[in-house]
Amino acid sequence: MPIVIVEGDLLEAETEYIVQQNCCTAMRPHGLSQIIAARWPHIDPYSFKTRLTGNWSTIESRPVPGSIALYENECGPNVICAFAQYIHGKPGRYVDPAGTKIPDTAVARFQYFKQCLTVIAGLEPTSVGFPYRIGCGLAGGNWDDYFGAITEWSAAHPEIHVVIYKI
């Protein structure tokens, strides 16, 4: 099934799931995750973490890059949080005060994103909505790469209806 690109609000999507990209280290939501958490407070993958310092969580409370968190939502589409970047911000902008050496380059983030897509396919969704330029705003990714990965993933899973929302 071909990817559909629509002008519209991702939070009003009629897909079974919507996907947002999240980082593993932050304590607070930013960008789209902040908008989602404001609308649906129970959908905040940062709220369960333990603070290390400032906006940094402890190593023990961080999700693994390439993993997802699934939030069921009675008030809208279910939300998939794709942990496709380790450190918040653009690659190389911050140094982890916990001293971890987990790769967080643009290349590593793109690989984490593709790992998340593989995990999402395992959910056997009927339809998935993505924000236009996922991974490319605050995270600094390249849309041509990310769109290419979504296109390839969609072609490999024709049973999944994929919609990209230009917010």
Question: Where are the language model's segments positioned?
Answer:
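Macrodomain-like recognition of ADP-ribose-binding/processing modules
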Residues: M1-I167
